[in-house]
Amino acid sequence: MLFRSSWKNQLYLTVTGRNDWDSKLAFSKQKSFFYPSVGLSALLSEMVKLPEVISYAKIRGSYTVVASSFDRFLTNPGYEYNSQTHNWANPTVYPMDNMKPEKTKSWEIGLNLKFWGNRFNLDATYYRSNTLNQTFKVDIPSSSGYKQAIVQAGNVQNQGIELALGFSDKWAGFGWSSNATFTLNRNKVKRLASGSVNPVTGEAIQMDEMNVGWLGKENVAPRVILTEGGSMTDI
């Protein structure tokens, strides 16, 4: 779904909506997922009188939700193949019927300015996004017939600024243009799975640290560890 509207060539509104049906959601209570976005921009240089030095001015803002599915077979796991023994074994992950897509909710605001007859231009943007419903595996009692269960939790936040400054002009048939950019991004693990509930035992989960792999050979290279309050690049 896409909707666009404008008012007097000064205000511009864009609204989108998308609904996906994913086969990975089979055997789950949620059969599809919807995610919208909305954006609004205003041409200040057309709405109000600005100083002569400013030839163009626009402000903009947007809010977006992007959804993505999880790995296959989490709602209906099949037999697992062991590449060492070349045998098939019963699934070890407890099947879940309430899986939800991972979602990233983001918003940004920006400003575009042009000066001195469009010779100089400035573009500034601030953004923030939060990624939710990440998939974690937690241990469960062997009496359940499985080794692990899936928990969806987590909150990883990204925020930053982007600045771009440009110059463009012509003299007697000779043109010159140059641009400079600056970006700054910071990410933070706001939450892992702590505070969630084990779907099998009903007990509260304590997970404020998670090992996600090695930067090379196992037990030799540095290890990447996620901790609540840390960043995605902590080692």
Which residues are covered by each model-predicted region?
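Outer-membrane beta-barrel and related beta-rich outer-membrane complex signature
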Residues: 25-29, 52, 65-77, 134-138, ...
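Outer-membrane beta-barrel signature, preferentially recognizing the C-terminal barrel domain
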Residues: 1, 76, 80-123, 149-171, ...
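Acidic helix/loop microenvironments that form the catalytic cleft of cell-wall polysaccharide enzymes
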Residues: 17-21, 63-65, 182-184
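Outer-membrane beta-barrel translocator/channel fold
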Residues: 46-76, 80-88
